[in-house]
Amino acid sequence: MSETIEGGVKIDRLSPGDGKTFPKQGDLVTIHYTGTLENGQKFDSSVDRGSPFQCNIGVGQVIKGWDAGIPKLSVGEKARLTIPGPYAYGPRGFPGLIPPNATLIFDVELLKVN
């Protein structure tokens, strides 16, 4: 199942979560993710590091595409977020890693809402 939300962020649901525990603005979330460019080049992965990532969602700590997309997932859900440049790193990109205005693809698993 696929849906497109705010900012053109596309959510492809890969496996369901509990269907009832969704993060709200300001919640601390624990996520496993792998980020790739459209050409398939991996630029970051919490899975490879063996350490899940934590952030407060919806408060500007992460890219806008995560702030928009992660609250649509329930705990345990796996999804692919396709995030257009303006909702990723925008015109600055991330020097040496992510080109300016690049669309990013994240395979994410919402492990926990704290």
From Swiss-Prot:
Inhibited by both FK506 and rapamycin. It holds the Pfam family FKBP_C. One of its GO terms (cellular component) is cytoplasm. The keyword Cell cycle does not apply. It catalyses: [protein]-peptidylproline (omega=180) = [protein]-peptidylproline (omega=0). Residues 26-114 form the PPIase FKBP-type domain. The keyword Isomerase applies. One of its GO terms (molecular function) is protein folding chaperone. Keywords: Cytoplasm, Isomerase, Rotamase. Gene3D superfamilies: 3.10.50.40. PPIases accelerate the folding of proteins. It catalyzes the cis-trans isomerization of proline imidic peptide bonds in oligopeptides. This is FK506-binding protein 1. It comes from Candida glabrata (strain ATCC 2001 / BCRC 20586 / JCM 3761 / NBRC 0622 / NRRL Y-65 / CBS 138). The lineage of its organism: Eukaryota, Fungi, Dikarya, Ascomycota, Saccharomycotina.
